[in-house]
Amino acid sequence: SGSCEMKTCWKSMPTFGDIGQVLKEKFDGATEVQSLKIGSRQQLVPTQRDFKPHTSSDLVYLVPSPDFCEEDLKVSIPVGLTFSHPPNQGSLGTHGRRCNKTSKAIDGCELMCCGRGFNTHIEEVIERCSCKF
């Protein structure tokens, strides 16, 4: 009948939100590992024996993150297979920091205060304002 069929294929990137969701899931399921010499090769092995071995697409880490809620000035940064303690690094914690009571973002009191609760402080400021009408 003279009709023809044409098929076109292309690849497209997932949305930024989809990529973020995959990364968040990988972060939440990350496995702490240690570098061990097995035979003549260095291998990354889970620190917890009951954890399954990781795959090449899993997220792994050698050093746990500091507790950002509490002060933790001791940070170990892997350098090769040894660890160094650089000065002026770590976490000062969140005690005493100002937060936004109504925010659900990282500046919000619920998140920043790490479940410890927070004090509300109301301050009234009276200023002279050279207003002209």
Swiss-Prot record:
- PANTHER family in the record: PROTEIN WNT-4, WNT RELATED
Coiled-coil positions are none
Share an example GO biological-process annotation for this protein: Wnt signaling pathway
- A GO CC term? extracellular region
Compartment annotation: Secreted, Extracellular space, Extracellular matrix
The UniProt gene name for this protein comes to WNT-4
Could you tell me what this protein does? Ligand for members of the frizzled family of seven transmembrane receptors. Plays an important role in embryonic development.
- The secretion signal range is none
InterPro entries listed in its UniProt record: Wnt, Wnt_C
Report whether Disulfide bond shows up as a keyword of the record. yes
Indicate yes or no for the key word Iron-sulfur: no
What is the designated name of this protein? Protein Wnt-4
Q: Which Cys-Cys disulphide bridges does the record give?
A: 69-114, 99-109
Q: What does the record say about PTM?
A: Palmitoleoylation is required for efficient binding to frizzled receptors. Depalmitoleoylation leads to Wnt signaling pathway inhibition.
Residues carrying covalently attached carbohydrate according to the record: 100
Give the originating organism. Answer: Strongylocentrotus purpuratus
- Tell me the keywords, alphabetical order: Developmental protein, Disulfide bond, Extracellular matrix, Glycoprotein, Lipoprotein, Secreted, Wnt signaling pathway
Annotated lipid attachment (O-palmitoleoyl serine): 1
